[in-house]
Amino acid sequence: YSAHLFLRDRGKFKQIALGDYQAQFGQGLTFWSGRAFGKGADILMIKRSATGLRPYASVDETLFLRGGGLTYELGKFEITGFYSYKKIDGNVIIQDTSGLAQEEIEAINQEGLSISSLQQTGFHRTPNELEDKDAITQQQMGGHVAYKTRSLNIGATGIFSKIDAKFERSLQPYSQFRNQESEQAKVGLDYNWIYRNFNFFGEVSQSIDAGKAITSGAIVMLDPK
């Protein structure tokens, strides 16, 4: 099921979202819910166009937020805050407690739910897939502050995400650099500047575990027409 209430341009409130919605900021390094298509034959696709908050009206089970958010206009600034709470799928690890003492079993239970990965296929066909359905609670909260003029947009984004399960780290080589923390926090700065026939854009982001990312680009129109 999915439902939402979405309002635009209600006085100083530019966007008000309740229920299922999406949030997109900057170039997506810090936070972007929903799909974003990469570069193709059309070179203009190298730049993402963030919409801020938007209603969710698709069928994918993972690419949305469930809760509420709003965007408030204050002069040349737009301030956005949002919160999401929903159940998501995860590959649950069943601990084998046969032959263990009661104290050991209680210690395992106190550690809470363990998962090997998050499931994003949306399939619930087999007993294992049904067991993984809605196994984890995910909470996300964050905000974005943007300064906007006719030719320049500068924004700052912060996001905190938490799930109520811990990852069992895989020993496979491809998993060694995968973020497997139950709590994540990121901050980022983004910009978009139009000067004559030039459009410069980009974003820099950093996570709480010191991971960094940066993207920057430019679109140049050789003819003003």
Label each region the model flagged.
Residues 1-225:
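Outer-membrane beta-barrel channel domains
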